[in-house]
Amino acid sequence: LKAKGYTTCHTGKWHLNGFFNDPRHPQPNDHGYDWWLATQNNASPHHINPKNFVRNGKAVGVIEGASAVIAAQEAAHWLRKERDKDKPFFITVWTHEPHLPIESAPEFMKPYADIDDEGIRQHHGNITQLDHAFGLLMKELDEQGLAEDTFVFFTSDNGPEGAGTKGRTRGSTGGLRGRKRWSHEGGIRVPGIARWPGHIKPGSINSDLVSNLDFAQTFLELAGVDSPPDMQGLSLVPLLAGKTPADWRTSLFDQYCEFPGPDGVRRHMGVRDSLYKLMHFYNLDEWVLYGLERDPREMHSVYG
């Protein structure tokens, strides 16, 4: 993108190295970002008034407010004041919310005042906190007259964190089985919402199999840049236009290989198509097979 003339900005979470803001590992600027405000992994001590943000290599200390809002406001500031307005732009905003440890500002918890469980109020407030932050960025695009010529994509990296039975770990998988680290639908089926005025039909829904491996090729095609031959994904541009290629993928593979690990999830791999999912817990040599049309919650294995 830089070679194509793009100016770039990243705000929020940066979980792509072991030594953050340290020359031993690449930092956001080493990955092509002109401007960045980020933390490694989680906001510390939590989402409210975080103290571990770094801007362009310099620690900034405590910032008052919610981390998602801070990230969105920084991106909006960059759009207004810092970017080269003669160049096209690329922004990534990776929020901490609603990753644990969850903490929500009181104003975002108010809509849930009738819920007795304070932890659930915190969780729901965290989603509202994120929604508010995303809205700030969309408003900035509108105010600068950029909305009609900007592609926006909202997604997540995995299903909800934690056990999910109560309080701040509640999360929501829409009734689907599994959470983060699982190959069950609740762990891998995540939001994917795109806005591209004049190209995407408002309210349209696509059910083809896609992966986060597809994002880079999509953004490169939109920018008119050829993808490197070793990239493994597929551009989503034809799907966004409602024109699924005849040779689009018919299956997806994933693997979780850490154990013992969080939540006691066993090592496993999974492959699915539009009708079935096969999972292998290879340390136990246990197989399960689910028919996703009849059993979308994956409650009854038909293996064997």
Predicted regions and their residues:
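Structural scaffold positions in well-ordered secondary structure
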Residues: 1, 13, 134, 152-154, ...
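Non-transmembrane alpha-helical segments in soluble domains
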Residues: 2, 34-37, 76-80, 124, ...
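Formylglycine-dependent
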Residues: 2-6, 15-91, 95-113, 121-124, ...
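Loop/turn elements at helix/coil->beta-strand transitions in domains of secreted/extracellular proteins
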Residues: 4-9, 31-34, 84-91, 146-152, ...
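Catalytic metal-binding/acid-base residues of hydrolase active sites
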Residues: 13-15, 96, 159, 199
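C-terminal cap/loop subdomain of S1 sulfatases and analogous C-terminal strand-loop tails that border
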Residues: 22, 26-35, 40, 160-185, ...
